[in-house]
Design a protein with these regions (language model features):
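Membrane-embedded beta-strand positions of outer-membrane beta-barrel proteins
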Residues: 36-38, 63-65, 83, 100-106, ...
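Short loop/turn motifs that connect adjacent beta-strands in outer-membrane beta-barrel proteins
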Residues: 21-31, 57-58, 75, 90-99, ...
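Outer-membrane beta-barrel "beta-signal"
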Residues: 87, 174-186
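Residue-level signature of outer-membrane beta-barrel architecture
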Residues: 53, 67, 87-89, 145-147, ...
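Flexible, solvent-exposed loop segments that connect beta-strands
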Residues: 66-78, 108-135, 167-169, 178
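Cleavable N-terminal export/targeting peptides
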Residues: 1-28, 186
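Outer-membrane beta-barrel pore domains and translocons
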Residues: 39-41, 66-68, 105-109, 158-164, ...
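Residues that define the transmembrane beta-barrel architecture of outer-membrane proteins
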Residues: 30-32, 43-45, 75-81, 98, ...
Length: 186
């Protein structure tokens, strides 16, 4: 009798404690995510901030803003506004919009170009570069991986290429889209 009473109390207390644990679903409902690209900040230095709106567990829509802080031509872009669409694979449950992703983007950028001017010298011509700022528009693709913890903090890395569509003789034809970003969902 005593064993049955202890067993009933034990099962009852375990059942009651299981009801008291409510899962934290706050991260599941968070639809906005703000990120800063740490790689661009260290390598540039350039400020690259992004906002992504989570559309579903498998897709997101957002934009990035890149500002070259050094004036030394970070990837030849002085300024870039880059809207993007991402499609996420694999880790669709849990937090959604995480895991491996493929991204398509377009970039509207102010690009620094160089136009050479030949100067005659006895040893041969010397070309002195003149800088110009031009507008460029590109389309591209990137791929990467994103992790999100239960607190809503995220880390991602991505790598991609964009091709400039406006032809000039003074700018590159392609540009990289590279990053290691830290962010927070809200």
């Amino acid at each position: 009798m005593k064993i049955n009473l202890i067993l009933c109390l034990l099962i009852g207390s375990l059942s009651y404690s299981m009801l008291g644990q409510v899962p934290n679903d706050d991260v599941f409902n968070e639809r906005g995510e703000f990120r800063i690209n740490g790689l661009a900040l260290l390598a540039g230095p350039a400020l690259d901030v992004s906002y992504e709106r989570i559309m579903s567990s498998s897709s997101g829509l957002g934009g990035s803003l890149l500002l070259d802080l050094s004036g030394d031509n970070f990837g030849s872009q002085n300024f870039a506004l880059t809207p993007f669409y991402r499609f996420y694979f694999f880790d669709l449950k849990d937090f959604g919009a995480r895991g491996f992703f493929v991204e398509t983007f377009t970039s509207f950028a102010s690009v620094r170009s160089y136009d050479g001017v030949s100067l005659p010298f006895p040893e041969g011509d010397f070309e002195e570069p003149k800088q110009k700022d031009l507008f460029q528009w590109s389309l591209g693709f990137a791929a990467g991986r994103k992790w999100v913890n239960k607190g809503g903090f995220s880390f991602e890395f991505f790598l991609g290429l964009g091709r400039y569509l406006l032809k000039t003789d003074y700018t590159d034809e392609v540009h990289p889209r590279i990053g290691a970003s830290f962010g927070k969902r809200f």
